[in-house]
Structure formats: C-alpha cells, structure tokens
C-alpha cells in the first residue's frame, strides 16, 4: 500500500513543485513567474488565441471567452460550452476559471487583469497580459506566447515570416511619396488615430493616414470630403457576420455602394477613381493585423511591391499557422496569388 501512496504522491509533486519555473515579462512590463512550460491555459481575446495556435500550442488551451467559443468555423468546433470563461476579456467568470484549474490566464491589457490577479492569486493561477491586437507589438506577443508554452522555435518562425515582409515593404517604399488614405472600421466615420488598435496596421502599409493628427476615432463625413483621400480602406460592416467564412459578393458590393453614395463623397478622389479596398473582419486581423497591412500595402503600391503577394500570405496564415483550409473572397476586389 505504501508504494502506491508514494507513487501517487510522486505524480502530484511532479505536476507542481518539480516543474521548472521561469519569469516572463508580459506586454505591460509585469514580471510573472510561471511553470515552464505551461500546459494548461485559459485565454481571452482571439488575437492571443490565434498566435497560440500559430506557435502550435492550441492543445494547451483549456478555456476561452464566449467570443472565441461562438466562432466555431475559425476554431473547427474545438471549444465546447463548458470551456467558456466569460463573455470577453472584460467580463470574466472567475468561478469557472478556478474550476478549470489552469496554470495561467492570458488576456489583453484592455481586459480586467488587475481584478483577475486579485481573484486568482489565492488559487495559484498566474495572470499574463498579452496585447496581440497591437500590430506594433506582434514580435513581443510572439516572444511572450512562444516562451510561455516552450514553443520558442515556432514563434521565431512566425515572426520571421512576417517581419521579412514588413522589412521588404519598408525598403521598397523608402523614397516613395505616401498615398493619402482614409481608413474606416465597421461603421461610418469610425477611423484610426495614434494609440488606437488599427493605427499601425495602416501605418506599416506605407499609407499617409489623413487622420494621423486627430485625437478621436470618430470623424465627421465632411472632414473626410475635405481631406480628399486618394484611397479608402474599409474593414467590413457591423451588420455583416464575420468569421472564417467571408462576406458574400453581394455584401461586399452593398458596403462599397454605401460608401460611394454618401453625400458629397462623389467629390473624393478615392471614389472618383474607384480606389476602394474592402477587407473582411476576419482577414484584416491575421497575425496581429499584419495580414491586413499586406493587403493595404499592395493595394496602394502594386508597382513598388511586385514581390509581395498578400493572398499568398493569407493562405500561409490559414494553412501553416492556423491549420485551416484556404478560403477565398475575404477582400473586395479579390486578389489572386500572383497579385
């Protein structure tokens, strides 16, 4: 009998005390001591989950927020209702998290991480902030999540894939006059300004954001007409369901027609010259929105970026990094693999 006891005891000791511990510096500079590698995590925010998937650690995820759970197409139904840890990173169910017994909770900086820390500390569950929605923090997010799950090599591969393309864009556009762009997210007048979630997606494409000096994301229609952008980039519309399955051609067309028919917008160069690019909500967000950056860059500077093929990038993101089949139709106009 004593042997069995010892063995049982041994198993539990190995799971906890004897696991190596490391310190990870998270997105907001907190130093968090965690078991290494983490094998049980609960995660809020799809940007984080996508990178965890891309580094090959999705099997370690034992709980997700409702937004992730309900997007069944993007996650191939792998998350069940009993894995839901709350509506979003801002609305967490701590009882559920404790019940799932993860080693860490990973959430974004706009989530309730301070509250989470307070609630989960007594149960030994560590809280890691990872801001994978910020394009300019993509490398840092890869480093954090690669380290947490001991998938450093895969994280390096993921970083390299996208950073090489970003460097190419930067080098090719060094002396090129910037094209003036109006970016709109979902609803009319909702643009991007410094500090906002979409700012660097647009910035890294080499665009001159017409509202780069504005302080509020909501802008008046007249201000857009007055600024007269050469290009308009829009991420979907709020009434279009967005997931791995793209909007229909009809939905894309309706979004474009709505833009073109706004009062006074027929005066805008982008509308006159039909320089309007629509990105689905799903496609713009890949790899901390760097997939979105690739499409915007190519749309603005096709001659200078002959070796950048955003549709191929999107296919690689799906097939290699998300383990999903490639699907077309996420942009309007559509890009071929050669474009």
Regions found by a protein language model. Name each.
Residues 1-36:
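Short, low-complexity disordered leader/linker segments with a strong preference
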Residues 17-21, 31, 115-190, 208-212, ...:
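Extracytoplasmic substrate-binding proteins
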Residues 27-29, 83-95, 214-221:
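Short helix-initiation/N-cap motifs at beta->coil->alpha
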Residues 31-35, 77-85, 204-214:
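A local structural motif
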Residues 32-34, 49-54, 69-74, 189-194, ...:
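Short, solvent-exposed loop/turn elements at domain surfaces
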Residues 40-44, 62-65, 86, 104-108, ...:
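Structural recognition of the beta-strand scaffold that forms the well-ordered cores
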Residues 43-100, 104-110:
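A short, structured surface patch at a secondary-structure boundary
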Residues 192-267:
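Flexible, glycine-rich surface segments
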């Amino acid at each position: 009998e004593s042997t069995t006891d010892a063995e049982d005891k041994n198993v539990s000791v190995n799971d906890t005390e004897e696991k190596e511990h490391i310190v990870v510096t998270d997105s907001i500079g907190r130093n968090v001591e965690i078991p290494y590698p983490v094998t049980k995590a609960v995660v809020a925010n799809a940007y984080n989950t996508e990178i965890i998937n891309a580094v090959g650690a999705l099997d370690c995820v034992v709980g997700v927020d409702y937004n992730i759970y309900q997007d069944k197409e993007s996650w191939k139904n792998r998350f069940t209702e009993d894995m839901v840890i709350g509506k979003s990173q801002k609305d967490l169910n701590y009882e559920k998290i404790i019940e799932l017994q993860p080693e860490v909770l990973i959430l974004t900086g706009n989530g309730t991480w301070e509250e989470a820390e307070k609630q989960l500390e007594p149960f030994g569950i560590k809280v890691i902030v990872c801001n994978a929605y910020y394009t300019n923090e993509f490398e840092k997010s890869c480093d954090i999540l690669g380290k947490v799950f001991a998938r450093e090599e895969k994280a390096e591969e993921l970083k390299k894939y996208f950073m090489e393309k970003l460097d190419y864009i930067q080098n090719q556009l060094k002396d090129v006059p910037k094209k003036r762009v109006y970016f709109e997210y979902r609803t009319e007048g909702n643009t991007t300004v410094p500090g906002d979630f979409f700012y660097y997606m647009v910035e890294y494409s080499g665009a001159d954001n017409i509202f780069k000096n504005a302080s509020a994301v909501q802008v008046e229609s007249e201000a857009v007409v007055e600024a007269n952008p050469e290009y308009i980039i829009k991420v979907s519309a709020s009434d279009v369901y967005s997931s791995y399955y793209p909007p229909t051609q009809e939905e894309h067309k309706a979004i474009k027609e709505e833009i073109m028919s706004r009062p006074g917008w027929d005066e805008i160069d982008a509308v006159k010259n039909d320089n309007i690019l629509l990105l689905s909500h799903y496609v713009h967000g890949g790899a901390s929105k760097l997939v979105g950056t690739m499409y915007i860059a190519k749309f603005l500077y096709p001659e200078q970026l002959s070796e950048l093929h955003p549709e191929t990038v999107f296919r690689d993101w799906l097939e290699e990094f998300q383990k999903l089949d490639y699907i077309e139709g996420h942009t309007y106009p559509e890009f071929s693999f050669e474009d």
